[in-house]
């Protein structure tokens, strides 16, 4: 069993599966960011091995994050593996934090592989402000993805980054 310096049990792990993202949010990433070379990023097999090791050490909850996890090639293999662990009662939960741009495409696959809740990063409901924050994101695509997830029975929590120039009007 893993424990922190105060002897509290560690049963949750956040796994960043990529540093890549299909948006360039002003508070997160510069437009000209240099991504890690592919050879320095964990392979899907290495991520699965890491999950298995931490599961054996007592971690029962996993959250996939990024960058944007749904742009990671073969990420569904990781989600399928987590679902297999869940079906074997080895883990309690696996979730995902996403910007929502690919959610409409993946909602049914996520639900079919045991994802019951997700966090969606959404910083404005104003299409122009959203595009300004994300550089080229389309708010409608994210909203459609959120509706798709909800229609699949996935619980959706919205994360918003409050910035100094963010007006309550937005």
State where each predicted segment sits:
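Conserved alpha-helical substructure of the radical SAM core
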Residues: 1-93
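A cross-family glycoside hydrolase active-site/sugar-binding cleft signature
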Residues: 16, 65, 95-99, 119-121, ...
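Conserved radical SAM core fold
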Residues: 17, 69-71, 100-104, 120-136, ...
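Distinct, well-ordered alpha-helical segments
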Residues: 75-78, 105-110
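Glycine-enriched alpha-helix->loop->beta-strand junction motifs that scaffold or abut catalytic
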Residues: 112-117
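Glycine-rich S-adenosyl-L-methionine
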Residues: 134-151
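Conserved small/polar residues in nucleotide/adenosyl-binding loops
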Residues: 169-170
């Amino acid at each position: 069993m893993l424990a922190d310096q105060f002897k509290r049990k560690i049963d949750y792990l956040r796994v960043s599966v990529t540093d890549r993202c299909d948006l360039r949010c002003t508070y997160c990433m510069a437009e000209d960011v240099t991504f890690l070379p592919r050879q320095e990023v964990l392979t899907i097999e290495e991520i699965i091995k890491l999950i298995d090791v931490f599961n054996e050490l007592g971690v029962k909850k996993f959250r996939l994050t990024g960058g944007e996890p749904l742009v990671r090639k073969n990420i569904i293999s990781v989600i399928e593996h987590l679902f297999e662990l869940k079906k074997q009662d080895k883990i309690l939960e696996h979730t995902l934090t996403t910007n929502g741009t690919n959610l409409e495409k993946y909602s049914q696959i996520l639900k079919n592989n045991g994802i019951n809740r997700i966090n969606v990063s959404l910083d404005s409901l104003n299409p122009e402000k959203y595009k300004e924050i994300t550089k080229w994101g389309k708010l409608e695509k994210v909203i459609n993805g959120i509706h798709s997830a909800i229609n699949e029975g996935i619980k959706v929590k919205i994360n918003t980054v409050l910035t100094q120039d963010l007006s309550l009007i937005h």
